Amino acid sequence: MHNSTDKSVKERFLDLLSEQFNTKEALATEIINLESILELPKGTEHFVSDLHGEFHSFQHVLRNGSGNVRSKINDIFQDTLTRKEINEFSALVYYPEEKLQLIKNSFSSKSELNEWYITTINRLIKLITYASSKYTRTKLRKSLPENYVFIVEELLYKSNKYNNKHSYYETLIKQIIELEQSDDLIIGLSFTVQHLVVNHLHVVGDIYDRGPEPDKIMETLIDYPSVDIQWGNHDVLWIGAYAGSKVCLANLLRICARYDNLDIIEDAYGINLRPLLTLADKYYDGSNPAFRPKNAEGLSELELEQITKLHQAIAIIQFKLEAPIIKRRPAFEMEERLVLEKIDYDKNEATLYGKTYPLEHTCFQTVDPNDPNKLTDEEADVIDKLLLSVQQSEKLKRHMTFLMQKGKLYLPYNGNLLIHGCIPVDEQGEMESMVIDGVKCYGRDLLDHFEEYVRIAFDHKDIQDDLATDLVWYLWTGKYSSLFGKRAMTTFERYFIKDKTAHKETKNPYYYLREDVDMCKKMLKDFGLDPEQGHIINGHTPVKEIDGEDPIKADGKMIVIDGGFSKAYQSTTGIAGYTLLYNSFGMQLVAHQHFNSKKHVLLNGADELSIRRVVDKELQRKKIRDTNTGHEIQAQIDILKELMHDRFVN
């Protein structure tokens, strides 16, 4: 009975498929096409990490493909163009709209401009021909400017072998110029180049954090042709807030206040902060130095005071909201983080981890020493209103939905493991376990459980105190969280305790064990990957190149690409971070210098890149056959061959 049911489902599937391929010839053509695609070189993967809301730096790296665009331009034009001309042409491909205006303004006559148009269009066609050489015509067509597909294809595939079409091709370009379509075409062709040099983008976590424009990054990613995301700790914080976690919401508001990024909340996402400001004005002092925003440049004294008050108000709400979760979830092992219960309010000191510290810069105006974790009625009302406003933001809904659709905690892809934070291990390198809903989880299984509960929380935004919603917050701050990767988050200590030893956050042993080849191979094997061929691509921790730290660890098994975009880390890293390229020939690590500005690139055309380092070179050029996409295509071929045998051979 079971077999006949299986067969009937299979038969129905083959029936549906045969409607699409209703002749032997149509089926054979598709099989030939797919088999041929498997033999093409694999496309270039581009890995970026820890964008931290820095839209302009991210956009530049995206537009130049971590130097890939410039590399292609050099390959073709290094013998025919000067360095200055290559710089000008590169800037045009990166920022076509703005560069076009600068160039047009530099010409004194229309005839000179028209000559430039002809030269530039021909150069772009030449560049696209080279950049698309490993793609099918169908794939290339999808990348071409929509309104000019016919014209561009004629120019791309032109053949004047018998000298019959010379004037035809000349007229095509002349008519483009005469009908004032040149600008649109050049802009479209430039974006085509950008999309061709990178086949797929991996964002290895933390789109959000202290930078001012994560919303613009999200809009860019939504429009990007092929992308996946591995959630970072800050991304999960925003997902949690939208999914109904008040404590996640309090945390992200506190971070925005700390770095003077409240514009993200109010202007970008339309969330009303007025109730919180009213509460803050009523209870808090605007001169508390511990709560002054880190980025105070350009703020008036009144604005500084307002943010300082708001910062205190939301921090206290956060500490109060953490307590009930810690108490109802003993498996989280976070009793030491019941910080408001650790305070002697008469002596103004706190006892944490067995040591007593004097407190400074305190702001406990709304804390009842007899019931320190209880929200006042005003605080409860404020956080309820804020959550409602967050969940009613259409823009935030769209961005968080995209994060869920394209995002995962980790991703095995083309033989490599992509993960933002860590795989929690103990000092001996054994996977650390955590009990979730009565089930002991560790390693890959632990991460799978975390992700499952994030999705449950997101699907049930109206429930705010279930295990799923609590676990989203745990991912932000818990000691067995793959995203946090430390034993405790010492936020309270950083605000109120002068002794810096209390601020220390001990990292999971993963962060020093990842230097070990055998450890990395073990992790790859645990995630179902070939330990000899695979790599772990890791974000989350800035690489302190200034102190001699190497982003390539464990004989190339571990590659750390974090620190690239957050300006706050650049003084400690010595660079503006790393991105990674993986094409059919192997992997290259790209180190980026500080991104000055778009204006600097437009005027000078110079990239803020340093020399690429080869991480791993393929002994044989990798084909699509060897990739995740190739395995999917092979599965399609197998089904089509079965249909051929079932319907046309017998």
From Swiss-Prot:
One Gene Ontology BP term is: gluconeogenesis
The record's listing under Pfam families reads:
FBPase_2
Tell me its EC number(s), please.
3.1.3.11
User: A Gene Ontology MF term for this entry?
Assistant: fructose 1,6-bisphosphate 1-phosphatase activity
Q: Which reaction does it catalyse?
A: beta-D-fructose 1,6-bisphosphate + H2O = beta-D-fructose 6-phosphate + phosphate
The domain of life is Bacteria
Task: Please give the cofactor(s) recorded in the UniProt entry for this protein.
Answer: Mn(2+)
Under which pathway is this protein filed?
Carbohydrate biosynthesis; gluconeogenesis
Return the SUPFAM superfamilies for the record: Metallo-dependent phosphatases
Which controlled-vocabulary keywords does the entry list?
A: Carbohydrate metabolism, Hydrolase, Manganese
Homology family: Belongs to the FBPase class 3 family.
Q: Name the HAMAP family for this protein.
A: FBPase_class3 (MF_01854)
**What is the name attached to this protein's record?**
Fructose-1,6-bisphosphatase class 3
